[in-house]
């Protein structure tokens, strides 16, 4: 980084001299601006190159800066400055490590009791080593399909809370379902239940101050995650908390794809029916979900809640058929945890890989793994939305379809409504449900959390849900897909060029 600073100083000095000379001889403000902008672009290009980013990211940034200097310069100020990311999150990482050493089991001994094939066990070792959370055999899970089932279950469990409620969400809206949640939380707070609520400051930027203040007045602790006050001077806008977590009394937890908003109940006229998946967890694994929340709470408030009140011995339930493991991923971690576990799941497959992702923007590793699996004769299926909510991501996703189709991947476009489910099922034996999409933002930038399931009954429910979803989807034909208009191909190509930045 010192070399980068020296280069930066040199570029600025040279740029200033050129700018002054240009301004003196031509006397044109435009010339001064042009030279300064050129120097700024050169400086950013040097910084990006010296950071040793992934080649695709480096090339994408250089292409944007070269083609659209002013737009690229502003875009970089907003989204590209990752060089001090590790320093920002060092305090959180140190605290997280201390918490894990103190409160997690030293080794996943119980895993040996799982009825897993030898080729699947490396996945468990990887998950424990880079995810640092153990597999629980004393937990029960229930798949919640879509909004009505999810919110019914959430409100039923919230009503039972006696000691504490912890919530962490990316999007919270003050619409009908948001108001219902507010009323329940206010009532529980008045009953003496401690309610803590982390909401992402960017994802929930439309949330009204009145909504927040009403909750605070009732005793709910409302904390925004990484508020952004000066967007162009801080790239905090780029690292968002995409997690959806609820923990009730330390024994019941929820995680999955649904935020708090009426659209998740199918009340948005554009999207209509909203297809999503959430997971209810009871028992030992909830302790991991609690730890993830407490680590994020400490990061934003400095408050340590590592007491028996919140981390008492977990609620013991009857040992289930399989294992449950909660894994957190984020820019504060050394490893690309979610991506590496997705990769390991894909490469462990012997029969089938079924993926549902609303935003499919894979990096080269995941893309290659899917193609190799399909070429090897494995039943690889991708379920994606037919109706976009983010057009640039939609077009970027479709740019990957031709090579996947050529490799033998079956691609289904969901037609009943909008697909927002983030699920992977491998061989009908392993699965992941959570907040992470199969895209670069979830892999590298966002704070995410997924539940990895091993030989649980819930996996059978996920398989049934997939089969039902395929009934409401159309399978893309390669020859027909190649007939799409030239303007669409251009949109896909440009979007794909930007995909490392998305």
UniProtKB/Swiss-Prot annotation:
Molecular functions (GO terms)? cardiolipin synthase activity
Offer one example of a GO biological process linked to this entry. Answer: cardiolipin biosynthetic process
Location of the active site:
242, 244, 249, 420, 422, 427
One Pfam short name: PLDc_2
Under catalytic activity, the entry for this protein gives: 2 a 1,2-diacyl-sn-glycero-3-phospho-(1'-sn-glycerol) = a cardiolipin + glycerol
Q: What Gene3D superfamilies does its record include?
A: Endonuclease Chain A
Span-the-membrane segments of this chain are 7-27, 29-49, 59-79
Q: What is its main location?
A: membrane
Q: Please, which domain of life does this record's source organism belong to?
A: Bacteria
> What InterPro entries is this protein classified in?
Cardiolipin_synth_Firmi (IPR030874), Cardiolipin_synthase (IPR022924), CLS_N (IPR027379), PLD-like_dom (IPR025202), PLipase_D/transphosphatidylase (IPR001736)
Q: Does the keyword Transcription regulation apply?
A: no
Q: Which HAMAP family match?
A: Cardiolipin_synth_Cls
Q: What is this protein called?
A: Cardiolipin synthase
Q: Which organism is it from?
A: Geobacillus kaustophilus (strain HTA426)
Q: Which gene encodes it?
A: cls
């Amino acid at each position: 980084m010192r070399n980068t600073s020296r280069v930066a100083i040199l570029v600025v000095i040279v740029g200033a001299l050129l700018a002054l000379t240009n301004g003196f001889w031509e006397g044109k403000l435009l010339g001064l601006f042009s030279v300064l902008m050129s120097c700024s672009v050169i400086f950013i290009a040097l910084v990006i190159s010296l950071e040793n980013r992934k080649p695709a990211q480096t090339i994408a940034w250089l292409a944007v800066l070269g083609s659209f200097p002013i737009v690229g310069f502003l875009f970089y100020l907003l989204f590209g400055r990752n060089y001090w990311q590790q320093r920002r999150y060092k305090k959180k990482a140190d605290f997280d490590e201390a918490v894990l050493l103190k409160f997690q089991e030293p080794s996943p001994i119980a895993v040996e009791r799982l009825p897993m094939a030898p080729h699947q066990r490396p996945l468990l070792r990887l998950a424990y080593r880079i995810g640092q959370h153990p597999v629980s055999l004393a937990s029960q899970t229930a798949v919640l399909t879509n909004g009505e089932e999810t919110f019914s279950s959430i409100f039923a469990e919230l009503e039972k809370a006696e000691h504490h409620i912890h919530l962490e969400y990316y999007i919270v809206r003050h619409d009908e379902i948001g108001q219902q949640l507010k009323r329940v939380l206010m009532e529980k707070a008045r009953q003496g239940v401690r309610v803590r609520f982390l909401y992402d400051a960017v994802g929930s930027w439309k949330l009204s101050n009145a909504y927040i203040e009403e909750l605070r007045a009732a005793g709910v602790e409302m904390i925004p995650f990484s508020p952004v006050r000066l967007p162009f001077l801080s790239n905090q806008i780029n690292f968002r908390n995409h997690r959806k977590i609820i923990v009730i009394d330390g024994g019941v937890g929820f995680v999955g794809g649904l935020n708090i908003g009426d659209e998740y109940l199918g009340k948005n006229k554009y999207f209509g029916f909203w297809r999503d998946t959430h997971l209810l967890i009871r028992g030992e694994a909830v302790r991991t979900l609690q730890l993830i929340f407490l680590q994020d709470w400490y990061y934003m408030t400095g408050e340590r809640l590592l007491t028996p009140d919140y981390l008492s011995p977990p609620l013991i339930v009857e040992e289930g058929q399989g294992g449950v493991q909660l894994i957190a991923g984020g820019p504060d971690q050394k490893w690309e945890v979610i991506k590496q576990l997705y990769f390991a799941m894909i490469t462990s497959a012997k029969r089938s890989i079924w993926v549902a992702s609303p935003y499919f923007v894979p990096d080269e590793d995941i893309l290659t793994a899917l193609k190799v699996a399909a070429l090897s004769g494995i039943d690889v299926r991708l379920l994606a939305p037919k109706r976009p909510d983010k057009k640039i991501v939609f077009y970027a996703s479709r740019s990957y379809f031709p090579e996947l189709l050529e490799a033998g991947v079956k691609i289904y476009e969901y037609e009943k409504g909008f697909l927002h489910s983030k699920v992977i099922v491998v061989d009908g034996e392993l699965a992941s449900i959570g907040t992470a999409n199969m895209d670069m933002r979830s892999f590298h930038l966002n704070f995410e959390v997924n539940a990895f399931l091993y030989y649980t009954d819930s996996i059978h429910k996920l398989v049934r849900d997939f089969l039902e979803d395929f009934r409401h989807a159309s399978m893309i034909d390669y020859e027909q897909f190649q007939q799409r208009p030239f303007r669409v191909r251009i949109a896909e190509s440009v979007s794909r060029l930007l995909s490392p930045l998305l």
